[in-house]
């Protein structure tokens, strides 16, 4: 049985009648304080909110259907779940971004089991990647699809980590240029070279694919050098899309990011991943399913829904009661920003060296005439 303790001294209390409304009154024998102990259902309501968000259930099917349920869970939409700080280094992590609108992107980092961090930004850029990565210990290898600004952030925050570009995304990039059914011999061969990247198992096969790529450029040199004029009369390569496809693979080979997963010094006897499927299928797909099940939410609530999903898939999420105590809310964040702005205005208004009024410039303290003053 749960014992009620005094809010003042912490000692065990006894029952002391009831109020006019019928609420149980409690008395502390030590300090003689009397009080009521109302039941707080916030934790139970938060658990209901969590179950609804991560399921296919519609609001009508929840207890307190419709408006009552929305009214009960509205306060939980004000909470911002914060990512943990990961201090233990890991062998492999995956990074990717999921766009919720044109100007809302959430960057996510995970390993094989858990979500490690997330960050909201307008689009993928080096500064946003740096903020995400600074809270996570540097891994041995990072798998990425080549998001904008990630290589720059990787050099700054995790300079010793090796980068593995997702081979499936490399293939998709080539397919975007050649299409799935190319009509030219050069296009068919380039498509097959890119497709074979998904089946490389050792460095010997990797070297063979690189040789095929070099030989492809030599074999079709005359064909690729053909020029044409655009609508403005300027000369352009006739097979520009094929050249872009070849350059996309050549760039990855030159950067040594296409076959990092074959490096035995990083594997420790285990097979390293060559694709970003863990985060694409294991996280992004589930996030899109959740947003589709609860479609119609505002962009702010969609962002927080993704945050909640990521938080409850971290290594050690807090309990519901602890979350309600420690996580920041819209109101607390607004209060913090308001205090920071007021402090900045105050600091700007205080005169600095050389800006303040000097008393002696406006008053005479001796009997010399004013004409003697500078």
Question: How should these model regions be labeled?
Answer:
Residues 11-14, 36:
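Short functional micro-motifs and their immediate structural scaffolds
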Residues 25, 32, 37-42, 48, ...:
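Acidic/histidine-rich catalytic cores and adjacent linkers
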Residues 23, 27, 34, 64-160:
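RNase H-like nuclease fold core
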Residues 6-9, 28:
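Short cysteine-rich clusters marking metal-coordination/redox-active sites
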Residues 145-194:
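Conserved beta-strand -> loop -> alpha-helix junction used to position metal-binding or nucleic-acid-contacting
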Residues 99, 148, 172, 283-284:
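Short hydrophobic/aromatic residue motifs in ordered secondary structure
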Residues 15-25:
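Short linker/helix segments within small regulatory modules
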Residues 54-63:
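Short, charged amphipathic recognition helices of the HTH superfamily
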């Amino acid at each position: 049985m749960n014992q009620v303790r005094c809010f003042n001294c912490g000692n065990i209390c006894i029952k002391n009648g009831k109020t006019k409304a019928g609420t149980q009154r409690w008395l502390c024998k030590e300090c003689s304080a009397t009080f009521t102990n109302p039941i707080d259902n916030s934790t139970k309501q938060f658990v209901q909110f969590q179950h609804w968000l991560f399921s296919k259930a519609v609001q009508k099917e929840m207890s307190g259907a419709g408006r009552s349920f929305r009214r009960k869970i509205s306060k939980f939409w004000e909470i911002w779940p914060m990512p943990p700080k990961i201090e233990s280094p890991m062998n492999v992590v995956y990074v990717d971004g999921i766009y919720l609108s044109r100007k809302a992107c959430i960057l996510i980092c995970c390993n094989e089991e858990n979500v490690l961090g997330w960050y909201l930004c307008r689009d993928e850029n080096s500064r946003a990647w740096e903020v995400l990565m600074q809270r996570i210990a540097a891994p041995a290898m990072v798998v990425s699809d080549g998001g904008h600004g990630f290589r720059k952030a990787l050099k700054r925050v995790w300079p010793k980590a090796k980068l593995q570009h997702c081979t499936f995304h490399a293939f998709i990039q080539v397919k975007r240029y050649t299409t799935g059914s190319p009509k030219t011999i050069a296009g068919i061969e380039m498509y097959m070279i890119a497709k074979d990247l998904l089946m490389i198992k050792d460095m010997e096969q990797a070297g063979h694919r690189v040789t095929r790529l070099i030989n492809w450029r030599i074999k079709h040199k005359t064909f690729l050098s053909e020029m044409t004029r655009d609508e403005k009369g300027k000369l352009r390569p006739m097979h520009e899309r094929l050249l872009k496809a070849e350059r996309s693979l050549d760039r990855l080979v030159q950067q040594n990011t296409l076959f990092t997963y074959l490096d035995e010094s990083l594997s420790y006897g285990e097979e390293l991943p060559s694709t970003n499927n863990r985060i694409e299928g294991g996280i992004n797909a589930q996030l899109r399913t959740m947003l589709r099940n609860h479609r119609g939410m505002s962009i702010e609530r969609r962002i927080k829904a993704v945050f909640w999903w990521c938080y409850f898939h971290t290594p050690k999420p807090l309990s519901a009661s602890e979350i309600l105590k420690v996580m920041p809310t819209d109101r607390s964040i607004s209060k913090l920003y308001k205090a920071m702005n007021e402090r900045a205005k105050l600091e700007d208004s205080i005169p600095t060296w050389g800006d303040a009024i000097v008393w002696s410039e406006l008053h005479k303290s001796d009997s010399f005439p004013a004409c003697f003053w500078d």
